[in-house]
């Protein structure tokens, strides 16, 4: 079965700031919108940012491979070269990383490159990649 796009709606504190981050920094094309929400083409998936005035994110962390991973988080598994290009784009834009781009589970079956950062509203994002994409669900 071909992979189907997912739909995810996340709260943001400011629609203009969300447009600048998702549209400008991440390069996601904008779809439909209204005063209180904006659709983005999030790497082939539908991400909707909904205005929630006064939003205060309260992150939680779980240890994974010696690092504190923010929970909840969302993101996409990219091709190797696209992941590296995105990491450089984020660095150039001055985005601060919660977990710097690097390798997790080195030498293990689940070895992957990953990075974590927050959008301006405190939503945690993770982007990851595998040299061999067939290892995504390998045990």
Question: Where are the regions that the model predicts?
Answer:
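Short amphipathic alpha-helical segments
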Residues: 23, 129-130
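Short glycine-/small-residue motifs
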Residues: 124-127
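Short alpha-helical
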Residues: 16-17, 81
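Conserved active-site tyrosine of GNAT-family acetyltransferases
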Residues: 18-23, 90, 122
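Vicinal oxygen chelate
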Residues: 1-6, 29-80, 84-118, 130-139
